[in-house]
């Protein structure tokens, strides 16, 4: 049953088919960025996470979509600049654009959902003229970095306003944003307004194949109404009157897909074997609940054992996706004393959604010689987190909230 305020999806937003099948139900969860200040008694509202799959275009959908105004308020906390893995991935994206499109000097680059302008700053280093569209308070950060930014949700009217002010961009980028957008049909129309024959579009998002292979069920949080395959993007390109010129698979966020779209590609990607492999995605997703049940049992036992021996544990990092395993494992102050974030994070001073676990600064982290294990909530960037912790003197064991071994039968 649809809950008040939610948008229920009844057909595929990519190809239009009504034959969507349910493949995964993770239960009810708070929004991952609904951060309540420490001491505030407000209780986060929870929304269902049910995944539907389209076997025609191989796209995974949230059955119930939370309105964008609730997901991305002006107080949205995420900032790209605070995660090294994200910044490194952005540099590689810019390098890929130079490799494919040549010298960027003087080119107009528009980043939709530009957040704090981190990607635009890298483009600017290469001589590009930089523009952004960003609905949250992060737009102020991007503007302060010297980029021309429209503080609004992306849509046809905003696209028309952009063209009136700045003309059509040469390159349009979406980095982990295309999955966040509420009304895909409206986005397609807006992109048609922005594009001219020479415009290239570069989209990077979580790849459904990597999510399946690495059991990354925690990426199915409310901010991602859709998760895409290469097949998905072939349909999206056709809707735009474009072609998929190339497809890459960066090892970012645990496995991304990066597609390069153009109106008349010099070379067109020939992903036939890839598209054939994606035919099994629906059945693979339908098998995921059994694997998740094994993870839940093993991780619950591992954390309970550590807590029984050491008392409540400290945890490192709160990426929004961690809200899902935290809820599914029933973690609270009895098991996790606090989660520590890099100084300057907007999450500090709040509690983890759906819990009373405080998010504190790394500067408040307890003695580095403490031999208690620590729980890493950012398991998808485990190497970065471990290097950071060891560099700060932490010598204890690290329990990753999700590990591939947890899913083994």
Describe each region flagged by the PLM:
Residues 173:
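A conserved beta-strand element that flanks and buttresses the S-adenosyl-L-methionine
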Residues 185-200:
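A short glycine-rich, Lys/Arg-flanked "PGG" loop and its adjoining helix->strand segment in the class I
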Residues 44-142, 216, 221, 288-305:
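Extended interfacial segments that mediate partner engagement and assembly in macromolecular machines
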Residues 96-97, 103, 122, 265-409:
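Hydrophobic, well-ordered beta-alpha structural blocks that scaffold small-molecule cofactor pockets
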Residues 34, 203-226, 230-233:
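Short, glycine-/aromatic-enriched active-site segment of Class I SAM-dependent methyltransferases
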Residues 119-157, 335-348:
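Class I SAM-dependent methyltransferase SAM/SAH-binding core
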Residues 2-84, 248:
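N-terminal juxtadomain amphipathic helix
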Residues 198-206, 397-400:
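Conserved beta-strand signature within the Rossmann-like core of class I S-adenosyl-L-methionine
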């Amino acid at each position: 049953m649809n809950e008040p305020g939610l948008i229920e999806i009844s057909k595929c937003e990519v190809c239009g088919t009504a034959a969507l099948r349910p493949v995964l139900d993770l239960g009810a969860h708070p929004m991952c960025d609904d951060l309540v200040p420490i001491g505030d008694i407000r209780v986060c509202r929870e929304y269902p996470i049910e995944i539907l799959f389209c076997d025609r275009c191989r796209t995974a959908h949230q059955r119930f979509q939370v309105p964008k105004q609730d997901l991305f308020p002006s107080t949205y906390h995420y900032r790209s600049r605070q995660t090294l893995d994200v910044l490194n991935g952005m540099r590689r994206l810019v390098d890929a654009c130079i490799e494919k499109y040549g010298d960027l000097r003087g080119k107009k680059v528009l980043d939709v959902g530009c957040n704090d302008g981190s990607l635009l700053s890298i483009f600017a280093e290469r001589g590009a003229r930089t523009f952004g569209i960003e609905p949250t308070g992060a737009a102020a950060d991007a503007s302060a970095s010297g980029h021309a930014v429209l503080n609004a949700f992306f849509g046809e009217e905003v696209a028309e306003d952009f063209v009136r002010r700045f003309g059509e961009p040469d390159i349009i980028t979406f980095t982990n944003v295309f999955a966040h957008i509420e009304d895909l049909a409206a986005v397609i129309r807006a992109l048609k307004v922005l594009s001219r024959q020479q415009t290239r579009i570069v989209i990077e998002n979580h790849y459904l194949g990597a999510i399946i292979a690495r059991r990354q069920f925690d990426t199915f949080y409310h901010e991602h109404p859709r998760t895409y395959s290469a097949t998905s993007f072939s349909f999206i390109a056709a809707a735009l009157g474009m072609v998929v010129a190339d497809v890459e698979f960066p090892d970012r966020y645990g496995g991304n897909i990066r597609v390069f779209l153009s109106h008349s590609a010099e070379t067109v990607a020939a992903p036939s074997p890839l598209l054939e492999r994606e035919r099994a995605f629906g059945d693979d997703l339908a098998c995921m609940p059994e694997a998740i049940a094994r993870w839940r049992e093993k991780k619950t036992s591992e954390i309970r054992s550590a807590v029984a021996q050491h008392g409540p544990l400290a945890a490192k990092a709160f990426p929004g996706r961690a809200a899902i395993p935290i809820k599914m494992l029933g973690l609270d102050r009895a098991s996790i004393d606090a989660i520590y974030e890099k100084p300057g994070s907007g999450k500090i001073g709040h509690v983890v959604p759906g819990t009373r676990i405080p998010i504190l600064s790394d500067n408040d982290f307890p003695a580095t010689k403490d031999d208690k294990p620590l729980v890493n909530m950012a398991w998808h960037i485990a190497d970065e987190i471990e290097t950071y912790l060891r560099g700060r003197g932490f010598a204890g064991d690290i329990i990753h909230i999700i590990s591939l071994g947890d899913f083994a039968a």
